From Swiss-Prot:
UniProt-recorded name of the protein: Metallophosphoesterase MPPED2
Organism from which the protein derives: Mus musculus
Free-text activity regulation comment from the record: Inhibited by nmolar levels of AMP and GMP.
Binding residues annotated for Mn(2+) 2, in chain numbering: 86, 117, 213
Gene3D superfamilies from the UniProt entry: 3.60.21.10
């Protein structure tokens, strides 16, 4: 597998034979392809906040999984904020408004947000099913009327909201998608395999920065308590073999906070909350050279 250069030509990703078992997939590809081993794949130390931004660069501030616990977060200097979902507990409009107010007080030139599995009201199909089931799993959501959440994303007036869509800011093409492998039936959950691959196939080539809620296989996706990898195999194959972004930012797995690289793409798990839901993981900053002509 080539490292350090973008893939050439049209690449078609198919469902991986180990799709349903990410831990087995990791072991197989590590043994047979050295796919997750040094020198290409390694941990990356975070940039200290007092590091001067290089000339001709844009500084990104990455956070995720704040879960309505933003009051004590110390936000560093930067140009563009990236939040990769789970900014609420249940996606209640009151939570979204509070988050939007917090965003409004931040000084970043652009603030880009995607949903996570906790933003229940942002997932229209999920909410339709929940109504049919009489809200039995999420009784606090039952107090909402459909008109309260039909256009809940419009409450995010202080950010750019992405859902299977892209935006270009300061010359960077940024794509965002909320989907994650099924886990206890939360929002934006899909079965591993073709269902998720169909979503990843929507991501166009030429993206500079990919925002997803969950991790790809093998990069900050280890859950120690379960002794399992939980990242998406199809997402990994899409990122490494087809899209080749400069930066892939995600969260979802609180235990996986940190930075890795495969020699071409930098992977950032920016989960702010720990596994015990304490918002103590600091935001991660990352500098990228400005695209030519921007």
């Amino acid at each position: 597998m080539a490292h350090g250069i973008p893939s050439q030509g049209k690449v078609t990703i198919t469902v991986d034979e180990y799709s349903s078992n990410p831990t087995q997939a990791f072991t197989h590809y590590n043994i047979n392809q050295s796919r997750f081993q040094p020198p290409h794949v390694h941990m990356v130390d975070p940039i200290p906040y007092d590091t001067p931004k290089p000339a001709g660069h844009t500084r990104f501030v990455c956070i995720s999984d704040t879960h309505s616990r933003t009051d004590g977060i110390q936000m560093p200097y930067g140009d563009i904020l990236l939040h990769t979902g789970d900014f609420t507990e249940l996606g209640l409009p009151s939570e979204v408004k509070k988050f939007n107010d917090w965003l409004g007080n931040l000084p970043y030139e652009y603030k880009i947000v995607i949903a996570g599995n906790h933003e229940l009201t942002f997932d229209k199909e999920f909410m339709a099913d929940l109504v049919k089931q009489d809200y039995y799993r999420f009784p606090s959501v039952s107090k909402l009327k459909p008109e309260d959440f039909d256009n809940v994303q419009s409450l995010l007036t202080n950010s750019i909201y992405l859902q299977d869509s892209e935006v270009t800011v300061k010359g960077f093409r940024i794509y965002g998608a909320p989907w994650t492998p099924w886990f206890n039936g939360w929002g934006f959950n899909l079965p591993r395999g073709q269902s998720l691959l169909d979503k990843w196939n929507l991501i166009p080539e030429g993206i500079d920065i990919l925002m997803t809620h969950g991790p790809p296989l093998g990069f900050r996706d280890w859950v120690p308590k379960e002794l399992q990898r939980v990242g998406c195999v199809e997402l990994l194959n899409t990122v490494q073999r087809r899209i080749r972004p400069k930066l892939h930012v995600f969260g979802g797995i609180h235990e996986g906070y940190g930075i890795m690289t495969d020699g071409y793409t930098t992977y950032i798990n920016a989960s702010t909350c720990t596994v015990s839901f304490q918002p103590t993981n600091p935001p991660i900053i990352f500098d990228l050279p400005n695209p030519q002509g921007s």
